[in-house]
Swiss-Prot record:
A GO term, aspect molecular function: magnesium ion binding
EC number: 6.3.4.4
Cofactor requirement: Mg(2+)
Enzyme class, first EC level, given as a word: ligase
Name of the protein in its database record: Adenylosuccinate synthetase isozyme 2 B
Binding-site residues for GTP, renumbered to this chain: 40-46, 68-70, 337, 363-365, 445-448
Keywords, comma-separated and alphabetical: Cytoplasm, GTP-binding, Ligase, Magnesium, Metal-binding, Mitochondrion, Nucleotide-binding, Purine biosynthesis
Gene it is expressed from: adss2-b
Residue positions binding IMP: D41, E42, G43, K44, N66, A67, G68, H69, T163, R177, N256, T271, R335
Pathway: Purine metabolism; AMP biosynthesis via de novo pathway; AMP from IMP: step 1/2
Location relative to the cell: Cytoplasm; Mitochondrion
Organism: Xenopus tropicalis (Western clawed frog)
Length: 457
């Protein structure tokens, strides 16, 4: 059979192309990935919402309900933490991958809260698919998270600033091979119960002050097992068939961001998963050649929640203005976000790891009132330029930032809908970022709504 007509033995008649090595490689659909390029809260939800309108499947690949995405549709503001925000597309399947950690009470509570807000989540249970290999966050993981933070505060005088959602402890259980997965929950419940009791006992011995109502938790988990069972699927096979079947738009919604990545972020002030592009493959069970466009989402300035190094932070009137105008409060914790100038050193580093094919520049309108705008272009230590983004936090805390000053535009851009309509200096700011990073900017955000995303190409 010719390649044009499909090859025997391949799913759905997938096409087999000979490679230079003579081996056969499958050609199928590719996933489009949206990732945060800074410390989170860049506006990924809005980019995902834009792309999700045409998507057949929208996936989450890592993290848990520590993430926070806000999406505004028909003047209704939906808040997502664990559910892929693409679930508001009635024609798409929302897929939670094996790299995600799931707190079941949080999942159902989030869905119910959003159901009360508008029509977006009607029928969500039929549109949600969960990998059977995803790990489960228990209430005692969350309680342990709080105790760990308290211990850090008492012992070191500072904590990590976690969301206390149990993310670190559950990923620790996963790495220690003592965690429980969705496949365990929906299979033999008596076997699940035994393993749950053993894990709870381990946590109780590590944290004697921890109170665990084992029987009460198991009863709740049995109820959740019945509700969630129809949603649980073998995620590897599900996505393999989607990738190698008829044409489909598959979107991956990254949570957290590059500088919060467990390996490449500002460790230890990071999250507990890989939120760079490698986490897409390991968190969904797909090969690298199935990854297509990788869109990085960048705020027109920089923000960070919690403690940790932040070279371009502005502890002054500028920082306060950005915080106030940008309504910079965490969706998950309600904490004030720290604010500062755009940092190109940080973005170049994020690009090295992720290979962004294009960027979305969010919240440009927040800069509308400034007469001049600074951009961090390089770092110095002891008066000498350093060519890289430092791994060591003590070093990163000591860097001096060299800034380029660009003229502001002092014009309201909230109602602008095309690039040509932007003030001249706003256009220059956008083009300057593109030129310095060597990455095209595909979207510019000038407001909260879906309509306020200007598409350039």
């Amino acid at each position: 059979m010719s390649a044009e007509n499909g090859s025997p033995g391949l799913p759905n008649g997938g096409v087999c192309c000979a490679t230079d090595s003579g081996r056969c490689s499958l050609v199928g659909n590719k996933v489009t990935v949206v990732l945060g390029a800074q410390w989170g809260d860049e506006g990924k939800g809005k980019v995902v919402d834009l792309l999700a309108q045409d998507a057949d499947i929208v996936c989450r690949c890592q993290g848990g309900n520590n993430a926070g995405h806000t999406v505004v549709v028909d003047s209704v503001e939906y808040d997502f933490h664990l559910l892929p925000s693409g679930i508001i597309n009635q024609n798409a399947i929302a897929f939670i991958g094996n790299g995600v950690v799931i707190h079941l009470p949080g999942l159902f509570e989030e869905a119910e809260k959003n159901l009360k807000k508008g029509q977006g989540l009607v029928g969500w249970e039929k549109r949600l698919c969960i990998s059977d290999r995803a790990h489960i966050v228990f209430d005692f993981h969350q309680a342990a998270d709080g105790i760990q933070e308290q211990q850090r505060q008492e012992q070191a005088g500072k904590n990590l600033g976690t969301t206390k959602k149990g993310i670190g402890p559950v990923y620790s259980s996963k790495a220690a091979r003592s965690g429980l997965r969705m496949c365990d929950l929906v299979s033999d419940f008596s076997e699940f119960s035994q393993r749950f009791k053993l894990l709870a006992k381990q946590y109780k011995s590590m944290y004697p002050s921890l109170e665990i109502d084992i029987d009460g938790e198991l009863k709740k988990l049995q109820d959740y097992a019945d509700r969630v069972k129809p949603m649980v699927k073998d995620g590897v096979y599900y996505l393999y068939e989607a990738l190698h079947g008829p044409p489909k738009n598959i979107l991956v919604e990254g949570a957290n961001a590059a500088l919060l990545d467990i390996d490449f972020g500002t460790y230890p002030f990071v999250t507990s998963s890989n939120c760079t592009v490698g986490g897409v493959c390991t968190g969904l069970g797909i090969p690298p050649q199935s990854v297509g466009d990788v869109y990085g989402v960048v705020k027109a300035y920089t923000t960070r929640v919690g403690i940790g190094a932040f070279p371009t932070e502005q502890n002054n009137d500028t920082g306060e203005m950005l915080q106030t105008r940008g309504h910079e409060y965490g969706v998950t914790t309600g904490r004030k976000r720290r604010c500062g100038w755009l940092d190109l050193v940080l973005l170049r580093y994020a690009h090295m790891i992720n290979g962004f094919t294009a960027l979305a520049l969010a919240k440009l309108d927040i800069l509308d009132v400034l007469s001049e705008i600074k951009v961090g272009v390089s770092y110095k230590i002891d008066g000498k330029k350093i060519p890289h983004f430092p791994a060591n936090q003590e070093v990163l805390n000591r860097v001096e930032v060299e800034y380029e000053t660009l003229p502001g535009w002092n014009t309201d851009t909230c109602n602008v809908r095309t690039f040509e309509e932007l003030p001249e200096n706003a256009k220059k700011y956008v083009r300057y970022i593109e030129l310095e990073l060597g990455i095209p900017i595909k979207w510019i955000g000038v407001g909260k709504s879906r309509e306020s995303m200007i598409q350039l190409f």
